[in-house]
C-alpha cells in the first residue's frame, strides 16, 4: 500500500492492492475469492468482509468527534483492478501538481487458474509419483505494470502504454527518485529472475520546488524521517511526508 494526498486537500489518502484481473479472460479463468461458507466462517471469527480488489481510501477529514472518516472510491476512480499487483506508488509523474499512481505487476505462475486446478486435481495426475514436471505447466502471469494519470477530479486515466510501461514482466518492488536532477521523479523497478528496470522520466516538469529537510542528528533521525512538507497555492495544498520505504519492498 501507499499513503499520500491524491486530491490536494491536505489529508493523506490510502491505496491498497489485491489481485483482481483487468483482462476479462483472466477473470473468467481464475478461481474467485472464498466460497460463501468460508466467507461467513471468517466473519464469524472477527474477520472483516473480504473482497479481492484494490481500494482507494479517500480521507474525508476529521468528524466533530475527532475521528477521521475514509471512503473507498477505487471503483469510481478506475483503479479497482490491476491484476496480480504488488507495489503502488502515489507520485506526480507528469508534473501537473497531482499525484499519479504507478503499480508493479505480475506473478511467475498463476496457482488459481481454474483449468490448471482441474487438471492437477485429476486422479491420473494425483497418482503420479513425480508431479514436478506438471507444476511447470502452471500458466505464467507475466503482465505489464500500470500507470494512471490523476485527472484532478478523483478519477484516473490509464496511461500505461502512452507513458512507456507496456513491457510484460514479473515486477515487485519499486522506488522513485529524481535520479538526474531535472525536477521529475524517475522509477527503479525490481523484477523476478530478471535485471531491474530504470525508467527515466522525460516529462517537462516546468517549475519545480526542491526542499532539503534536515533531521535531528543527535536524536538519531538524521534524515528527518516522518517530517511533513506542505505547499499551498490558492485552494490547492500539496502535502509530502518523508519515509524511506513505500509500496511493497
Question: What does each of the following model-derived ranges do?
Answer:
Residues 1-8, 58-59, 86-95, 172-180:
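Beta-propeller blade termini
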Residues 2, 52, 84-86, 143, ...:
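Beta-rich catalytic cores
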Residues 14-17, 101-105, 182, 186-191:
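Hydrophobic beta-strand segments that make up the repeating blades of beta-propeller
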Residues 18-20, 62, 107, 193:
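Residue-level signature of beta-propeller blades and closely related beta-rich strand-turn architectures
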Residues 27-37, 51-71, 114-118, 142-157, ...:
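Beta-propeller blade repeat segments, especially FG-GAP/WD-type strand-to-loop junctions
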Residues 36-48, 71-82, 131-132, 139, ...:
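Short loop/turn motifs that recur once per blade in beta-propeller domains
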